[in-house]
């Protein structure tokens, strides 16, 4: 087998690896959907799921139209790409890279949905997604990942211009702790500040009422994200080489120790394992290690994961203290842990692997510049645009719709619980005991309806039995009145019904005398 054949085979293996990793990253979308739906209240879970599906479609379309060109097109002074719009090419490496990067832009967008859940309009969220994926993310991506990143992955592909200005400085973010996760976190922060907290979230009367609909679903989503993250970090290498095993083990260890750190902190602070910390811990570890998973050893990855979890939990508590309502903890996990992961590159990475030619202190400064630049651009642009948009088109749903739940208000998605409430309301107003609620052994509302119907069956039977005896007693009383009238025809005893009505005292005497008269007649 000659060198050319080996080279083609190697390229094909690399392409297959990146495609498989892109599929794994796509699966992360399902993980986000499960996690965010599980952490949202039941009345909003369908809305959250639909947003996760819709933002993926919007993200891919925007990336195809504008994003890829802005991010990887010929650079204008390292700030923005100027071509490759309406992406089209016959080069398989470019095609593969487009698919992989399209998964990344969808991830950045879906981070936002969880933070603003339960009160942002569906159409408003799609507008936010367009802004994030067509403008903010691609421009920032160009600064750090532009054509030089592509040429690093595929050395035989012609580059399209100079590198982004952050790349020229030596900024390193291997798989996107800042470029993907912090960008999504900054936009999410702008969104929640403009929207404000959910109605009653920080009222003492509602303490404990804002819990997720299903922690098992949320934890399942966390595990799916963990699984997909192997593709997220592994595919960023761009090739199936000796670096991949290190990337995967660092990814796994950071997440595992993040999880254990979350459990440990929950035992220390709450004396019990908190399911929310089980969600925050591994995800924070994964976000933190994303920037340096190819350039640190396993011990460093463990430290990065542990500190990432601690920072995420502290940030989560600070948000609660300042009444910044982030439904799923997107800001602590993706923004705070992402910043830490980017800083950790300068602290723990092997400088030879980084290949920037900078000292550790110089690398630290460059990483800081990158974090600040990305933060200012992402937050400022998103906050200004959303603030202006909110003045013309309110992004938040009405209080009535928020209380009702976005499943019904925005999608007309009627649940078993809503059907049961409607039945109870109709029954209370009509008094009809024959009305029955919805039954479904696979939903909470349906199970309640099943037992409610059993109770109503017994109540209806009891009511029928009561009516039966009431009618029988009434007939017996009528018969007794007829008998007495035959003995005392001049007296109208129907004026004195014996159906629980109290007679005046003088009437008792008349009835008693009539009774004595009847006995005397029978005796004679």
Which role does the model predict for each range below?
Residues 1-427, 433-451, 455-456:
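Hydrophobic alpha-helical transmembrane bundles of multi-pass membrane proteins
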Residues 422-426, 433-444, 462-524:
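… and, occasionally, acidic/histidine-rich disordered N-termini of signaling adaptors
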Residues 455-463:
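Signal-transmission/dimerization alpha-helices at domain junctions
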């Amino acid at each position: 087998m000659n060198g050319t054949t080996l080279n083609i085979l190697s390229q094909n293996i690399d392409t297959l690896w990146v495609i498989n990793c892109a599929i794994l990253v796509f699966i992360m979308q399902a993980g986000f959907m499960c996690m965010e739906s599980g952490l949202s209240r039941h009345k909003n879970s369908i809305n959250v799921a639909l947003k996760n599906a819709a933002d993926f479609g919007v993200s891919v379309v925007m990336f195809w139209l504008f994003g890829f060109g802005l991010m990887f097109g010929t650079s204008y002074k390292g700030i923005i790409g100027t071509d490759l719009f309406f992406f089209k090419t016959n080069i398989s490496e470019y095609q593969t890279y487009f698919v992989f990067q399209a998964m990344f832009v969808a991830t950045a967008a879906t981070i936002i949905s969880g933070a603003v859940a339960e009160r942002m309009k569906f159409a408003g969220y799609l507008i936010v997604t367009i802004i994030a994926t067509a403008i903010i993310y691609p421009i920032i991506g160009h600064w750090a990942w532009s054509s030089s990143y592509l040429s690093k992955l595929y050395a035989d592909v012609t580059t399209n211009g100079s590198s982004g200005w952050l790349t020229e400085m030596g900024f390193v973010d291997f798989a996107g702790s800042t470029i993907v996760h912090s960008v999504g976190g900054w936009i999410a922060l702008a969104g929640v500040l403009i929207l404000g907290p959910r109605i009653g979230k920080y009222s003492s009367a509602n303490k404990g009422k804002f819990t997720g609909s299903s922690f098992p679903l949320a934890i399942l989503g966390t595990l799916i994200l963990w699984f997909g993250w192997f593709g997220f970090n592994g595919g960023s290498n761009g090739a199936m080489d000796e670096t991949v095993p290190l990337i995967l083990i660092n990814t796994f260890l950071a997440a595992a120790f993040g999880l254990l750190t979350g459990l440990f902190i929950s035992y220390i602070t709450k004396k019990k394992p908190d399911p929310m910390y089980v969600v925050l811990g591994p995800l924070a570890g994964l976000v933190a290690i994303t920037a340096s998973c190819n350039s640190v050893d396993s011990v460093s990855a463990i430290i990065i994961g542990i500190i990432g979890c601690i920072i995420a939990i502290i940030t989560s508590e600070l948000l609660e203290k300042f009444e910044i309502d982030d439904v799923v903890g997107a800001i602590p996990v993706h923004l705070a842990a992402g910043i830490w992961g980017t800083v950790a590159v300068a602290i723990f990475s092997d400088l030879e692997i980084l290949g920037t030619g900078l000292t550790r202190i110089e690398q630290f400064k460059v990483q800081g510049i990158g974090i600040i630049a990305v933060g200012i651009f992402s937050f400022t642009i998103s906050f200004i645009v959303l603030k202006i948009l909110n003045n013309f088109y309110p992004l938040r749903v009405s209080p009535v719709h928020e209380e009702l739940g976005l499943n019904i208000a925005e999608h007309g998605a009627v649940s078993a619980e809503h059907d049961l409430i409607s039945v109870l309301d109709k029954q209370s107003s009509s008094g009809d005991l024959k009305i029955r609620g919805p039954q479904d052994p696979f939903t909470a509302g349906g199970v309640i309806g099943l037992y409610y119907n059993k109770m109503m069956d017994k109540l209806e039977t009891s009511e029928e039995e009561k009516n039966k005896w009431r009618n029988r007693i009434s007939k017996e009383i009528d018969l007794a009145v007829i008998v007495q009238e035959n003995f005392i025809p001049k007296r109208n005893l129907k004026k004195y019904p014996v159906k629980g009505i109290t007679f005046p005292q003088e009437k008792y005497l008349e009835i008693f005398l009539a009774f004595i008269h009847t006995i005397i007649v029978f005796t004679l």
